[in-house]
Amino acid sequence: MPILNERDQAAVRKEFERIAGPVKLVVFSQSLAAPELCQQNEQLVREVAELSDQITVEVLNLAIDHERAEAYGVDQVPAIVVEGARDWGIRFYGVPPGYEFSNLIDSIIVASTGKPGLSDATLASLQALAADVDIKVFSTPT
């Protein structure tokens, strides 16, 4: 049974008209660690990828493909790496439902363009930071 209904698929296709280049979604799973969540995550990512010919999916096992996981900085499952022409460090842990789903879609578009959609003032403020910043957003299902 599909996760995305026809209305959601149409809305995502419309958003994906803004994709400017290829995007790879690297999914890390492990059937023993979180079988239901990993399966749901893989299905969702595959359904999303079917909505644009610019999106490819690679599914890796966290335990077997540990070198790739380490290279991406992934240490838990389920995980999604959103990668455009380069790796921008965009990661999703857990299945991105609800409001997080729209963030996944936006992240795919941002990764395809390489432009975060921030104002010049915000970009200047970020450039002034003395060190890298790791931003983490946590959410819980409601």
Task: Report each predicted region and the residues it spans.
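Contiguous, structured surface segment used for ligand recognition
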Residues: 45, 69, 104
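Structural micro-motif
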Residues: 22, 66-91
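Local sequence-structure signature of Cys/Sec-based thiol-disulfide redox active-site neighborhoods
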Residues: 8, 12-52, 127-142
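Long, charged amphipathic helices and adjacent flexible linkers at domain junctions
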Residues: 111-129
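Non-catalytic, surface beta->alpha helical segment in thiol-disulfide oxidoreductase systems
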Residues: 81-116
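Thiol-based oxidoreductase modules, predominantly thioredoxin-like and allied folds used
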Residues: 53-65
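Catalytic cores of nucleotide-enabled group-transfer and carboxylate-activating enzymes in metabolic
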Residues: 22, 59-61, 77-80, 111, ...
